[in-house]
């Protein structure tokens, strides 16, 4: 801040006297005493000096009284140097700690400086007195200033928010937070005052009659709201008892357009009772004190002590008068627009609230019923509110309540009546306050839609801690908790998240300031519920009380960290909450009632029906009482928009307040917050007193220290790349190369050029971040740069003005000398006799000469008149012919328009065909989906088949059980052993088969690999697929045969037959459905034919792009025609005829080409139509073939099913026979079954497991069948999709070729038009150049002759000045060399100091490590040392920055020194040259003086002759031989044009409508141009305003630069003294740095002066040289021109003849061009033929595509014909590929032809341009009279250029569409790749299926062998049974042992053995032991 002396009274409270602070004595005292801060109970912290260190304790001496004390090291806090005393931003403090912050705030507060910056926000301490710092003069001081330019103030915060809103277009908010009485409301008013003054809407507006009405109303809204919403409390005389959010809306220009006020939680209970020494709302006291007698009688007012609701009577406020405040409130209402009736009605309601309190009730003797002994007060109340007294008393004492469906009268007790009256009084006052806010908003918010952005000012009740706190205090403290959480989140969380989001190096710091636990304790809805949720829950229960609420709260939240039971006031308080500002004890009396807020329905209804309209309006929403929102769709009432809640939903006060607070927080989060932290200095409301402990508590709670720390450690300043480059590129002029560069790269280059320390900045993803102060330093550098530029500009301007004045003086001096010489000569000559004779004879000679000249002129005049009449006749004839040509041109244009319409129709038809094609593709997709549905049905049939097989397996199990029952024990043993051996053999066989299958699998894999390679080759694919198909069919047939054999031996045929019958019926239904689908396809085919006809009509939509381009071309042609018509309106007939003829010929050629194109396109469309009809016929044929194939497939399926039925019937008969035999055997073997039951069970388990495995294998076999068929189907589908995609790619490629051809054509048309425009522009430029050259030459001749002598004298004086300046420069250079040597010495000393500082930093780090190892106070020591380390690193960075800046300045100084040396040498050379030139000029001066006199006389004579000759030349130019030239030319052009018109007239008769369309398009373009022009003007206006604002700011900054530079120099000199031990050495360094800085500044100033002088001398020398050269050149040119003027008359005839020859040559060249264009047209016809051939090929490809689509319908039956379709599709795909290859070759050939034609066209255009230039150069001398016309034409040419640019834009759009088509092609390629991937997946599935098939075959063979063994064993057993029976019959009774021994016979390898019983048992046990492994 600049140093100020003799400060005025207001500035004493803003600015700090830095002279006192920078006192060297205080600095030395601080250094010597080693001052620190120690804790103090009284002062918070006290200053002391360290005397002795004793381990962890330190002996200190208090600075105030000299006492000594021992203090722990951890309790000591460092003291800042004296220069930081009363610092404006506490982030600048080197030692940041609580003591330093408190000391700084205290010093500033005692000096009257109440505002202090604390990093990113502002701290304000309530002064408790009025300060003169809020006047309009102070506002003007802060207006438009940046934050660092002015001292801290609420106005600076407001200005910053206002500027950010305008620049960033982001909504702002200013949040004034703090405890009650801290000054939030006053600061809010000052913010509104500043914004109303700065953004006044009447400034710059037209209506000056109502100046600032909106601003006045905005300022007067606060007094009204304070009267009705503020009250005196113990802590604050003007405490806001409600919260408000004031939203001020601004328009785009920054003017206020309206405002809106939202209020929160009015403390309405204050209206009925107040605490001790407190007052109710101000309006009650103001009304009773300030109302007049008449008003008192109207309002029935009484004294203060007569009202019960004024609990404490009248309590005055010191320094305020209620009477005066009442008048101010009334005046504010009038300004706000309140009517007299509204004010009176409001005051009546206020009086009625007081009257409510005076109503007294009495308890009757025998009952508890209340009564009203006296109704005088009730009468007054009813009179004021417009109610009936009887009804009111009845409603209070015996209200009607609803019981069921009926209403009954209920008597009230005295307590209930008193409560009802108080509730009515509170509700009435609350509704009055809501109406007041709504009325103010209605007055302020007059323009809702104009507000572009807003600034919100939040003034809400501050944090309150009373002795006992109620529900209102809980809501207020809850709000402040949320606001503090928003502050913490914004300052600490979001700031660091942005660092991480931008990717810069940053370690996340947790400051431990999260207030969410306390907020959750209050607002959490559940798990566990918070205070508000529990309160709402208790309101639902009828028997709930405040005590039950407290009990539930303790039960739910008793363990919460922020919840405690009260300790001090255990009897009075109920619970305690730990807020961020401290512990608060709450008493829950009447909380349920306050939350529910019940009201008497009867009285509310009476108030709603009041005779007073105002009262009735207040109670309009009577349905919302008792907290029950029963109205869902309420309209806007007097209180604004109604609450829209669900019907019947219970709404408590807590819920409503929570919702409004949530909305407020959402609004604040969407704005950019600006925080103002208000601090209360003491609770006594005394000025000049500051309680340090109170302030410290508030600073800790508000997070001030943390905010300062993150501001210092972080990167608070950030700027986006583009803005940084735009603003600071002036500092690095050559760092960024020309052209486009990424913003990040540009910023990196700029940073490198600025040579900033890497620690001072970070580069993120989209922004560049700086530490505090770096951006301000860059701003200063930028201001210095701009100052240098402005100084240089001023010097140039002053030098120019001085030279101009000097030249004028020199001119006057030479004129005086000439007059003197002439007078002296005349005085000598006048008495000479011969002179007298000469003067008498000379006039006579001149008279005779004049007569001769007049005769000659008369003759010439007659000749010229004759020529003029002749030329006029020719002109009329040419104009008549020109009109004919124009008519013919119009006819041709109409014909062209009709032809283009035909072409448009053809293009639309083509578009419709394309749309039809798209529809057919959609139909194809539908058919594919139906095919998929059929596949699903087939899958269902397969599932049913599986079910049948499961039933068959069940039958087989039953059959196995019967067989097992018949088998005997011995045979089972034999068979089991045989099975084991056979299984071992089968395992070997299976291994062999497995190896074979592996080999086959490898072969299959090789074949599949071959298939994938053959897919790329496309021709060999069909053969490989056929091989794979045959092998798969063989495998499938083998599987089916084996399955049938098993089914023959296992199935129970009766059930199978029924199942198969059902299956046949299902198949027949399926065949019927397929037949129906065929019929549907036939119907769809007919629909396709109809849609194809519609598609032909829709095909024309594709020509829209071409029509647009043609329209643009026609618009350009119309512009050219208008320009030519402007030419024709002038008199220069010959030039007009020539240009018109060229334009007409070019237009005819363009019309010819367009006509041929349109004819070709119509023929092509006809051919397309015929081809479409052929395609439809082929589709019909393909459909018929498909139906035939389908019928054949159905017949084949029927035959196969018949054979299957026959085989099943045979199997059924065999099974029946077999079953009969088994039943016979069953009866004989039942007895044997009982004996063998135990062994049979074991065997049955083994059998069951094997059968279960067999079932699984059968199911796997069936799944494999399905997978194989599915794989075949998918393979076919993929092949078909590949073909389809290839066809689509071909079609897209053809479409792309057509689009490219169209683009080439449009580009040619645009190029032709551009060439025409360029030709005309070149004509204009050359003509204007000739005109300017002629005029400048004439002026130069006159000026140069006059300035010769003046320049000679100037050069002599300049030479003398140069000699003097060179001598001065040499002396100054010697001085600068000495100063440079001195600076080098100072820099070396600085480097030594830097090294010492680094050593000190290392020592400090060692000390830090030692401190960390301390045992007892680890945490405290670590934190303190961390803070010290941060401060030291900041200081070290600062020192490094200073040293780097000095090094940069030294480099710059060296560069300047080298430049000065070069400049001095250059000036020495120039001095020598100037001396030589001066000597030469002296010799030439005398001869030039003589020549000048002669030239002046000759000049006058030649000027007369020149004028005469010019007149003659102009007449000749306009008339000479025009007739003879033009007649022949026009006749020839007429014949050619008539012939062309006759040829084209028959073809161009239908083009009339196109002309009207072009005119409409022209009108639309003009309208668009006007709109764009208006928008551009508006943008220019806003940009100019911004530039003016920036210019004003720059001028202010330039004026303040010197003072700021002085401050910066002092700060840099003092910054070195950061370390105590280095103070003595650093003082010497400071002196050296100051001396070096002063010397450097002097050197820089001298160098700048020398540079400016050098540049002036250079410019003067250059001007002298240039003027000398120009004099010589002009003298020579004047001589040449004098000679050429004599020869010009003779050359006129020759030029006319040459122009005639040039015209004939131009006509010949035009004929040649016409022939060349005709040849190019023939070439174009060949191109069109090639195009037709390609279109025919495209049609053929489309036919093939439709054939492929028809093939897709053949996929319904995929079981037998999949491989056939694969073969056919592969062959078709190969054919398509070959056809596509051919079409690609043809396309490449066409492209080569196009390139050749383009080259030819370019050659033709170059030839045309060269010939046109030749004709133009021949005719250049004839265009003198058309200068004014050509200027007008230049403007029209500019318009034509705009049209050309539009055409280019449209061409770009066409190219974009082409790119879209290419993207579609890429998408098709991706689909193709996906299809290939799907093919590979199917191959893998096929391999897995083959493996499963091998496993199934092995298991099937195994089962078959087991079945054979079982049947053999069964037969053997039956034989043994028969033999045993025979023995029994023969042998008679046999003993049991013998029979047992006889039965135990084993058959092993064909031999029988007889075993004993013991052996048998042992064998049985062996068998049992060996069986379990088998079952496993």
Curated annotation (Swiss-Prot):
Phosphorylated by ABL2. It comes from Mus musculus. This is Myosin-10. PANTHER family: MYOSIN HEAVY CHAIN, NON-MUSCLE. Residues 786-815 form the IQ domain. Residues 1129-1155, 1698-1708 have a biased composition (Basic and acidic residues). It comes from the Eukaryota. ATP binds at residues 178-185. Residues 661-683 are annotated as: Actin-binding. Residues 31-81 form the Myosin N-terminal SH3-like domain. Residues 85-783 form the Myosin motor domain. GO terms for biological process: actin cytoskeleton organization; actin filament-based movement; adult heart development; aorta development; axon guidance; axonogenesis; brain development; cardiac muscle cell proliferation. Residues 1125-1175, 1697-1718, 1874-1976 are annotated as: Disordered. Pfam families: IQ (PF00612), Myosin_head (PF00063), Myosin_N (PF02736), Myosin_tail_1 (PF01576). One of its GO terms (molecular function) is calmodulin binding. The modification Phosphoserine is found at residues 1145, 1935, 1937-1939, 1952, 1956, 1975. The rodlike tail sequence is highly repetitive, showing cycles of a 28-residue repeat pattern composed of 4 heptapeptides, characteristic for alpha-helical coiled coils. Myosin is a hexameric protein that consists of 2 heavy chain subunits (MHC), 2 alkali light chain subunits (MLC) and 2 regulatory light chain subunits (MLC-2). Interacts with PLEKHG6. Interacts with ECPAS. Interacts with LARP6. Interacts with MCC. Interacts with KIF26B. Interacts with CFAP95. One of its GO terms (cellular component) is myosin complex. In newborn kidney, expressed in the mesenchyme and ureteric buds. The modification Omega-N-methylarginine is found at residues 18, 1930, 1940.
């Amino acid at each position: 801040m600049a140093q100020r002396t003799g400060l005025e009274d207001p500035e004493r409270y803003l600015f700090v006297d830095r002279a006192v602070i920078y006192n060297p004595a205080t600095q030395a005292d601080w250094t010597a005493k080693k001052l620190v801060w120690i804790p103090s109970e009284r002062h918070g912290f006290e200053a002391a000096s360290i005397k002795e260190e004793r381990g962890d304790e330190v002996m200190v001496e208090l600075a105030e009284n000299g006492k000594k004390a021992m203090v722990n090291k951890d309790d000591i806090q460092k003291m800042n140097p004296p220069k930081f005393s009363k610092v404006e931003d506490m982030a600048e403090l080197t030692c940041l700690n609580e003591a330093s912050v408190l000391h700084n705030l205290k010093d500033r507060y005692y000096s009257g400086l109440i505002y202090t910056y604390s990093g990113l926000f502002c701290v304000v301490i309530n002064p408790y007195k009025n300060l003169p710092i809020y006047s309009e003069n102070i506002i003007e001081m802060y207006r438009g200033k940046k934050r660092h330019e002015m001292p801290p103030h609420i106005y600076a915060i407001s200005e910053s928010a206002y500027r950010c809103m305008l620049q960033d277009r982001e909504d702002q908010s200013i949040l004034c937070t703090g405890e009650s009485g801290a000054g939030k409301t006053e600061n809010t008013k000052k913010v509104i005052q500043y914004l109303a003054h700065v953004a006044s809407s009447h400034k710059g507006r037209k209506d000056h009659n109502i100046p600032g009405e909106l601003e006045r109303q905005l300022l007067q809204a606060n007094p009204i709201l304070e009267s009705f919403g503020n009250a005196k409390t113990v802590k604050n005389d003007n405490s806001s008892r409600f919260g408000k959010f004031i939203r001020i809306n601004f328009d785009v220009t920054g003017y206020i357009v309206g405002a809106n006020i939202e209020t929160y939680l009015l403390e309405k209970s204050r209206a009925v009772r107040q605490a001790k020494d407190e007052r109710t709302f101000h309006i009650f006291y103001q009304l009773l004190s300030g109302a007049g007698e008449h008003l008192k009688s109207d309002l029935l007012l009484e004294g203060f002590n007569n009202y019960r609701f004024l609990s404490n009577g009248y309590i005055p406020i010191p320094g305020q008068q209620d009477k005066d405040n009442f008048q101010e409130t009334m005046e504010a209402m009038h300004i706000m627009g309140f009517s007299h009736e509204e004010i009176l009605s409001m005051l009546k309601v206020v009086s009625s609230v007081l009257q409510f309190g005076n109503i007294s009730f009495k308890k009757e003797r025998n009952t508890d019923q209340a009564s009203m002994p006296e109704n005088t007060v009730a009468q007054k109340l009813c009179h004021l509110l417009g109610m009936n007294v009887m009804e009111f008393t009845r409603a209070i004492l015996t209200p009607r309540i609803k019981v069921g469906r009926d209403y009954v009268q209920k008597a009230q007790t005295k307590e209930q009546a008193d409560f009802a009256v108080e509730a009515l009084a509170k509700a009435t006052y609350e509704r009055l306050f809501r109406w007041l806010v709504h009325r103010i908003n209605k007055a302020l918010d007059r323009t809702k839609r104009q507000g572009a952005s807003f600034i919100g000012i939040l003034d809400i009740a501050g944090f309150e801690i009373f002795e006992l706190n109620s529900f209102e205090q809980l809501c207020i403290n809850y709000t402040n908790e949320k606001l503090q959480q928003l502050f913490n989140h914004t300052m600490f969380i979001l700031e660091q998240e942005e660092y991480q989001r931008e990717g810069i190096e940053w370690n996340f710091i947790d400051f431990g300031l999260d207030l969410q636990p306390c907020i959750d304790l209050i607002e959490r809805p559940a798990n566990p519920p918070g205070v508000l949720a529990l309160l709402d829950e208790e309101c639902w229960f009828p028997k709930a009380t405040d005590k039950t609420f407290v009990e539930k709260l303790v039960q739910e939240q008793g363990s919460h960290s922020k919840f405690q039971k009260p300790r001090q006031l255990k009897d009075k308080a109920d619970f305690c909450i730990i807020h961020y500002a401290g512990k608060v004890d709450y008493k829950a009396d009447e909380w349920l009632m306050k939350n529910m807020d019940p009201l008497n329905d009867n009285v509310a209804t009476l108030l709603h029906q009041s005779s007073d309209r105002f009262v009735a309006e207040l109670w309009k929403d009577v349905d919302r009482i008792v907290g029950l929102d029963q109205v869902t769709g309420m309209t806007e009432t007097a209180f604004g928009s109604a609450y829209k809640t669900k019907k019947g939903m219970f709404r408590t006060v807590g819920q409503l307040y929570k919702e409004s607070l949530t909305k407020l927080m959402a609004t604040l989060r969407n704005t950019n917050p600006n925080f103002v932290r208000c601090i209360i200095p003491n609770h006594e409301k005394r000025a000049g007193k500051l309680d340090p402990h109170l302030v410290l508590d508030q600073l800790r709670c508000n997070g001030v220290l943390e905010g300062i720390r993150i501001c210092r450690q972080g990167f608070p300043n950030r700027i986006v790349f583009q803005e940084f480059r735009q603003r600071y590129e002036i500092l690095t002029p050559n760092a960024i190369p020309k052209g486009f560069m990424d913003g990040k790269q540009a910023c990196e280059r700029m940073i490198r050029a600025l040579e900033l320390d890497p620690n001072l900045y970070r580069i993120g993803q989209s922004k560049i971040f700086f530490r505090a102060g770096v951006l301000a330093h860059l701003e200063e550098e930028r201001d210095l740069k701009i100052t240098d530029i402005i100084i240089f500009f001023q010097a140039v301007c002053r030098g120019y003005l001085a030279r101009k004045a000097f030249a004028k003086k020199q001119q006057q001096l030479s004129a005086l000398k000439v007059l003197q010489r002439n007078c002296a000569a005349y005085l000598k000559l006048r008495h000479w006799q011969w002179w007298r004779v000469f003067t008498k004879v000379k006039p006579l000679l001149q008279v005779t000469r004049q007569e001769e000249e007049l005769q000659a002129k008369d003759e010439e005049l007659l000749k010229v008149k004759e020529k003029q009449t002749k030329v006029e006749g020719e002109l009329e004839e040419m104009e008549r012919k020109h009109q004919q040509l124009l008519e013919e041109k119009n006819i041709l244009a109409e014909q062209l328009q009709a032809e283009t319409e035909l072409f448009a129709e053809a293009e639309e038809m083509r578009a419709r065909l394309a749309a039809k094609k798209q529809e057919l593709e959609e139909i194809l997709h539908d058919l594919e989906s139906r095919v998929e549905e059929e596949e699903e049905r087939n899958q269902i049939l397969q599932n049913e088949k599986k079910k049948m097989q499961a039933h068959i397996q069940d039958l087989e199990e039953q059959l196995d059980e019967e067989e097992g029952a018949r088998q005997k024990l011995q045979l089972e043993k034999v068979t089991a052993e045989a099975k084991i051996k056979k299984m071992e053999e089968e395992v070997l066989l299976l291994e062999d088969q497995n190896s074979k299958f592996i080999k086959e699998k490898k072969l299959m894999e090789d074949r599949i690999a071959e298939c994938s390679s053959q897919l790329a080759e496309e021709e060999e694919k069909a053969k490989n697929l056929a091989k794979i198909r045959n092998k798969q069919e063989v495998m499938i047939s083998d599987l089916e045969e084996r399955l049938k054999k098993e089914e023959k031996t296992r199935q129970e045929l009766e059930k199978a037959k029924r199942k198969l019958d059902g299956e046949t019926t299902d198949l027949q239904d399926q065949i019927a459905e397929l037949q129906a689908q065929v019929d549907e396809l036939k119907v769809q085919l007919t629909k396709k034919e109809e849609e194809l006809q519609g598609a032909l009509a829709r095909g024309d939509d594709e020509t829209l792009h071409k029509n647009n381009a043609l329209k643009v071309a026609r618009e350009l042609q119309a512009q050219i025609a208008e320009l030519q018509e402007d030419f024709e309106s002038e008199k220069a007939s010959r030039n007009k005829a020539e240009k018109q003829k060229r334009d007409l010929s070019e237009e005819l050629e363009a019309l010819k080409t367009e006509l041929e194109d349109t004819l070709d396109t119509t023929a092509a469309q006809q051919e397309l139509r015929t081809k479409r009809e052929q395609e439809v016929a082929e589709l019909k044929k393909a459909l018929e073939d498909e139906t035939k194939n389908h019928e054949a497939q159905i017949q084949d399926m029927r035959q196969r099913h018949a054979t299957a039925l026959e085989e099943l019937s045979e199997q059924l008969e065999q099974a029946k026979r077999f079953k009969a035999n088994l039943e016979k055997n069953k009866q004989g073997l039942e007895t044997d079954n009982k004996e063998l039951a135990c062994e049979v069970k074991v065997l049955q388990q083994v059998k069951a497991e094997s059968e279960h495995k067999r079932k699984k294998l059968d199911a796997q076999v069936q799944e494999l069948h399905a997978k194989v068929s599915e794989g075949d189907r998918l393979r076919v589908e993929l092949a078909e999709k590949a073909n389809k995609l290839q066809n689509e790619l071909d079609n897209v490629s053809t479409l792309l070729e057509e689009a490219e051809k169209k683009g080439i054509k449009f580009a040619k048309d645009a190029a032709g038009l551009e060439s025409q425009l360029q030709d005309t522009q070149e004509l204009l430029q050359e003509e204007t150049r000739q005109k300017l050259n002629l005029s400048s030459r004439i002026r130069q001749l006159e000026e140069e002759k006059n300035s010769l002598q003046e320049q000679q004298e100037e050069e002599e004086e300049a030479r003398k000045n140069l000699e003097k300046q060179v001598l001065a420069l040499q002396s100054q250079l010697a001085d600068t060399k000495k100063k440079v040597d001195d600076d080098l010495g100072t820099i070396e000393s600085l480097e030594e100091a830097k090294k010492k500082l680094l050593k000190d930093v290392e020592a400090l780090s060692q000390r830090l490590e030692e401190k960390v190892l301390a045992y007892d106070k680890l945490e405290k020591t670590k934190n303190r040392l961390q803070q010290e380390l941060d401060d030291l690193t900041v200081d070290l960075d600062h020192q490094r920055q200073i040293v780097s800046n000095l090094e940069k300045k030294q480099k710059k100084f060296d560069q300047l020194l080298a430049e000065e040396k070069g400049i001095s040498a250059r000036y020495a050379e120039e001095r020598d040259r100037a001396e030589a030139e001066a000597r030469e000029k002296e010799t030439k001066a005398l001869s030039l003086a003589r020549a000048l006199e002669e030239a002046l006389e000759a000049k006058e004579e030649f000027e007369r002759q020149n004028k005469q000759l010019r007149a003659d030349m102009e007449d000749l130019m306009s008339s000479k031989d025009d007739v003879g030239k033009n007649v022949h030319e026009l006749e020839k052009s007429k014949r050619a044009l008539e012939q062309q018109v006759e040829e084209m007239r028959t073809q161009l008769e239908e083009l009339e409508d196109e002309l009207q369309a072009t005119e409409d398009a022209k009108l639309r373009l003009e309208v668009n141009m006007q709109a764009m022009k208006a928008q551009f003007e508006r943008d220019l206006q806003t940009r100019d305003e911004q530039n003016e604002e920036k210019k004003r700011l720059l001028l202010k900054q330039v004026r303040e630069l010197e003072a700021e530079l002085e401050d910066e120099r002092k700060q840099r000199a003092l910054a070195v003294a950061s370390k105590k031990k280095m103070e003595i050495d650093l003082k010497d360094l400071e002196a050296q740095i100051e001396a070096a800085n002063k010397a450097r500044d002097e050197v820089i100033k001298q160098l700048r002066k020398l540079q400016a002088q050098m540049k002036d001398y250079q410019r003067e020398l250059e001007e002298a040289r240039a003027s000398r050269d120009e004099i010589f050149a002009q003298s020579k040119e004047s001589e040449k021109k004098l000679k050429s003027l004599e020869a010009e008359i003779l050359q006129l005839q020759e030029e006319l003849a040459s122009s005639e020859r040039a015209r004939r040559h131009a006509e010949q060249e035009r004929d040649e061009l016409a022939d060349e264009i005709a040849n190019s047209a023939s070439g174009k016809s060949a191109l069109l033929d090639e195009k037709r051939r390609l279109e025919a090929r495209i049609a053929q490809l489309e036919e093939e595509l439709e054939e492929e689509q028809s093939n897709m319908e053949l996929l319904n039956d995929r079981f037998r014909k999949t491989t056939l379709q694969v073969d056919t599709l592969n062959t078709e795909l190969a054919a398509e590929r070959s056809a596509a290859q051919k079409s690609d070759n043809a396309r490449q050939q066409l492209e080569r032809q196009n390139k050749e034609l383009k080259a030819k066209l370019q050659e033709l255009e170059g030839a045309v341009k060269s010939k046109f230039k030749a004709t133009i150069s021949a005719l250049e001398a004839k265009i003198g009279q058309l200068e004014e016309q050509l200027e007008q034409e230049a403007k029209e040419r500019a318009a034509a250029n705009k049209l050309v640019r539009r055409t280019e834009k449209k061409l770009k759009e066409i190219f974009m569409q082409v790119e879209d088509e290419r993207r579609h092609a890429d998408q098709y390629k991706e689909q193709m790749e996906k299809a290939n991937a799907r093919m590979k997946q199917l191959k893998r599935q096929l391999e897995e299926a083959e493996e499963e098939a091998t496993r199934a075959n092995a298991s099937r063979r195994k089962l078959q062998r087991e079945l054979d063994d079982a049947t053999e064993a069964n037969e053997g057993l039956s034989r043994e049974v028969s033999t045993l029976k025979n023995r029994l019959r023969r042998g008679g009774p046999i003993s049991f042992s013998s029979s047992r021994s006889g039965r135990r016979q084993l058959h092993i390898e064909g031999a029988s053995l007889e075993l004993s019983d013991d052996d048998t048992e042992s064998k049985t046990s062996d068998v049992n032991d060996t069986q379990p492994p088998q079952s496993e």
